[in-house]
């Protein structure tokens, strides 16, 4: 799956995946985006604790929490409560949608975007946004 929905978490070793790219919450509390086996982005929180988890909050903030539920990294995108999704896109970018509030900035131009689960993969940003808006309105 390439999407983390509001209220969902990634436990240590769990990840978003779209084939080539993996966005993983590692055992060492580092949240890392890999292109095949090469790390291309990270929260740089490795070694701060063990067995942290990632939470996509209903306020749009993506947060790494320690086992004691202390935040150790955040996307700083918190705002109004609503339905948000964190998407690992086909272009290698990880983006929080409600309105786009945060991204890793690692996209490769022209790669397209993966679709919402249960739908066919989409080839354009406009098509992806239609599906994201549908999710945000109906959830």
From Swiss-Prot:
Alphabetical UniProt keywords: Antiviral protein, Disulfide bond, Lectin, Mannose-binding, Plant defense, Secreted
Binding site for alpha-D-mannopyranose: 26, 28, 30, 34, 37-38, 41-42, 44, 57, 59, 61, 65, 72-73, 76, 83, 89, 91, 93, 97, 102
Predominant place of localization: secreted
CDD domains reported for this sequence: B_lectin
Name of the protein described by the UniProt record: Mannose-specific lectin
Single Gene Ontology BP annotation: regulation of defense response to virus
GO MF terms, alphabetically ordered: D-mannose binding
Aminoacyl-tRNA synthetase in keyword set: no
Natural source organism: Narcissus tazetta
Subunit structure as annotated in this protein's UniProt entry: Homotetramer; antiparallel.
Note: Has a significant inhibitory effect on SARS-CoV-2 in Vero E6 cells (IC(50)=0.8 ug/ml). Viral replication is fully inhibited at concentrations from 20 ug/ml to 5 ug/ml, and 50% inhibition occurs at about 0.4 ug/ml.
